[in-house]
From Swiss-Prot:
It comes from Alligator mississippiensis (American alligator). This is SRY-related protein ADW5. The keyword DNA-binding applies. InterPro entries: HMG_box_dom, HMG_box_dom_sf, SRY-related_HMG-box_TF-like. The keyword DNA-binding applies.
């Protein structure tokens, strides 16, 4: 069972598509670096919708898998 996405992952899922549309030949590593820099530059107020969505995903995950324990 996969862990639920955190706020960065929720946001980056949307943003990655935009970058790939603009630069389809860009390597995944470069896209990830750009996403990391962009996330750091976002204001906390801009992150709120993604934090809320990630919280909802976490709650749903807890309800769906009540005995889940992360084991790397």
């Amino acid at each position: 069972v996969k862990r639920p996405m955190n706020a960065f992952m929720v946001w980056s899922q949307h943003e990655r598509r935009k970058i790939m549309d603009q630069w389809p030949d860009m390597h995944n590593a470069e896209i990830s670096k750009r996403l990391g820099r962009r996330w750091q530059l976002l204001q906390d107020s801009e992150k709120i919708p993604f934090v809320k969505e990630a919280g909802g995903l976490r709650l749903k995950h807890m309800a769906d898998y009540p005995d889940y324990k992360y084991r790397p």
